[in-house]
Amino acid sequence: MKVTVNRKAHFNAAHRLYNADWTDARNATVFGKCANPHYHGHNYELIVSVKGEIHPETGFVMDMKILKSLIETEVEDKFDHKNLNEEVPEFKTLNPTAENIAVVIWNKLRSKIDENLELSITLYETPRNFVTYSGV
């Protein structure tokens, strides 16, 4: 029997969506206000979901204390109150869209979580705009 456990986290970060190969006009057309050269910020909500079999001895799919610690060290400490474009190495050459942020977070956590467990990342950029990435 597989069960999914979820852990919520939050971080605040600034970013700018743009393509350096495009003109300012094209960036503004494609990314709108998000292309502001002075950046803008979001209060991100993150849901990390881990799915797997319940361990017969512990009753856990995954120890939530371990998951909490991984999220703190791999996501919150690295992204919270940061300018993603300027301060997070992965986004020096990768546009920090919600989609790309979710993939980066998934990659950071995947190697730290038992390979027998499924991992899914849901990232809310706003209460109505969110993405989910499951590594597929």
Task: Describe every region a protein language model picked out.
Residues 1-136:
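Charge-rich, low-complexity N-terminal segments
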